């Protein structure tokens, strides 16, 4: 609701949910002697750095890296990694969305960028993208969307998958910082076929569409009713 609202008016409704999590290989972490925290006690930056240090010798035997992480051109980079900036007290624009200078280039954001840089400096991630590094069992961690669960289940069944809470800054204020949101559907008020466009938007953002999106593409539905129609969201720990 919030993402499609402007000046207290609703303009668009999300058709699916595209949360991102920190995926991990249970076997690698077990070999390294690493325990995963619960959602209320996520790893801080310093703690996660120590974890990466512990798993690095294990993945090096597999010719891999502790972290399967890249910064591709496009919306994925800002979507996946914005919570790192937010949990450190940073942001990208001011509250009215009109000012960048002094916000994007803040001290807090520089700290976040330097934290990312430490992954490279310490060899915890590759300098170039390696296709399916995590999926092939050669990385301990990967930040990815909810769709990754289905991809691994179907194409990489040997990966012992787990999902951990997002890593937070050492200055964490206790809030929840995780990518969440959706592609949304809307209709222009000036369209020539408003009635038909309205029906399409209603269906695409409704319960039945959510069920179909889940059945066909394993995209998380955006309505509670569609979620509750499938028992997997209660039975599978990686979907909860």
Short names for language-model regions:
Residues 48, 55, 133-141:
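Hydrophobic residues within well-ordered alpha-helices
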Residues 1-21, 46, 51, 60-63, ...:
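Hinge/lid segment of periplasmic solute-binding proteins
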Residues 209-211, 225-240:
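Extracellular/periplasmic bilobal clamshell ligand-binding domains
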Residues 11-12, 56-73, 206-217:
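Bilobed periplasmic-binding protein-like "clamshell/Venus-flytrap" ligand-binding domains
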Residues 32, 107-110, 114, 121-125, ...:
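Extracytoplasmic/periplasmic substrate-recognition and gating elements
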Residues 49-54, 90, 95-127:
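Glycine-centered hinge/linker elements that transmit conformational signals in sensory
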Residues 2-38, 69-97, 179-187:
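Periplasmic solute-binding protein
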Residues 140-144, 162:
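Paired acidic/hydrophobic, glycine-rich loop segments that form the ligand-binding mouth/hinge
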């Amino acid at each position: 609701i919030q993402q499609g609202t402007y000046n207290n008016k609703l303009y668009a409704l999300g058709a699916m949910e595209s949360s991102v999590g920190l995926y991990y290989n249970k076997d690698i972490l077990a070999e390294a002697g690493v325990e995963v925290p619960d959602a209320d006690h996520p790893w801080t930056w310093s703690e996660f750095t120590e974890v990466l240090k512990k798993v690095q010798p294990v993945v090096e035997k597999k010719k891999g890296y502790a972290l399967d992480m890249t910064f591709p051109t496009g919306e994925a980079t800002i979507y996946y990694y914005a919570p790192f900036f937010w949990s450190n007290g940073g942001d990208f624009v001011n509250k009215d969305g009109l000012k960048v200078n002094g916000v994007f280039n803040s001290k807090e954001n520089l700290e976040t960028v330097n934290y990312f840089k430490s992954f490279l400096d310490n060899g915890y991630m590759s300098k170039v993208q390696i296709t399916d590094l995590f999926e092939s069992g050669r990385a301990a961690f990967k930040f990815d969307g909810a769709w990754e669960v289905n991809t691994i289940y179907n194409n990489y069944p040997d990966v012992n998958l787990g999902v951990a809470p997002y890593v937070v800054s050492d200055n964490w204020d206790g809030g929840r910082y995780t990518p969440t949101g959706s592609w949304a559907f809307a209709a222009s008020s000036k369209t020539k076929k408003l009635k038909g466009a309205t029906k399409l938007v209603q269906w695409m953002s409704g319960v039945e569409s959510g069920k179909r999106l889940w059945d066909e593409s394993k995209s998380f539905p955006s309505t509670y009713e569609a979620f509750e129609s499938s028992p997997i969201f209660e039975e599978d720990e990686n979907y909860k």
